[in-house]
Amino acid sequence: MTKNRSFLHAVVSTARPRQWLKNLLVFAGPAAAGGFDSWATVSESLWVFAGFSATASGTYFLNDVVDRENDRRHPTKSSRAIAAGQLSYGVALVIGFLLLLLGIYLASVPRWQSGAVVALYALLTVMYSLVLKRIPLVELAVIAAGFVLRAMAGAAGTETPMSTWFLLSITFGSLFVASGKRFAELLEMGERSVETRSALSSYTLTYLRQLIVFSCTATAIAYFLWAFENAADANSSIPYHELSIIPMV
């Protein structure tokens, strides 16, 4: 019984269910378009959310197998199930690939286009784990693209058109998150950071700080333009879109 619980705990911890919060971005497009007054849109979004969550968890299994040696040298990642030897590589690979297939299937239930976006995310993430994470700037772009693909999958699954400004606000917002994450890693680990992530050797705190400021500013500008663009088409007595920019001012 204890062994089964340990195995289950290792599987769940590797799946990282807390990270599913990122997948709430699949609701961004339909929510911004006011589409949640329809149960059909809600159910379609839930299918995509479930699919993206399963797929993302699958990529974590594959990534942890690839990263196991680096994780063992990291102060916190060394406790991950695969790095700590609590979950075998073979079992992790099987679970990872099964979750990828399940996720793509679930995301395809409302429309094949959303499944295609999730499949693209899976492919990009696997490439990131194998190669792209070692290339400076490219690895930041891939992380940002992952967030953008979440929003695109939700829009595709519900046939919600996404404006250029809204997509740009998500893109730059994602770059802000990615650069902030690398800044925190470099600040915490210092020179030792290259032992766990080789791309960090090409970054400096000053450069990442500038990238954070740029992406944050670009996010705000793109969002303001989206809000005012949609306000002109809303024909509402209450300026919801204009009011939404207040927290960002």
Where are these regions (language model features)?
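Topogenic membrane-insertion module of multi-pass membrane proteins
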Residues: 1-72, 85-98
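C-terminal membrane-associated helical module and adjoining short loops/tails
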Residues: 1-12, 19, 130, 148-249
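Residues within membrane-spanning alpha-helices of integral membrane proteins
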Residues: 20-23, 49, 57, 96-97, ...
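Helix-loop junctions at the membrane-solvent interface of multi-pass transporters
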Residues: 32-35, 109-110, 130-131, 156-157
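Alpha-helical transmembrane segments of multi-pass membrane proteins
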Residues: 52-63, 121-125, 146, 150, ...
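Multi-pass membrane catalytic core of lipid/isoprenoid biosynthesis enzymes
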Residues: 68, 73-118, 164-175, 209-221
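Transmembrane helix-loop-helix
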Residues: 92-129, 133, 223-249
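Cytoplasmic-side transmembrane-helix entry/capping segments in multi-pass membrane proteins
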Residues: 136-146
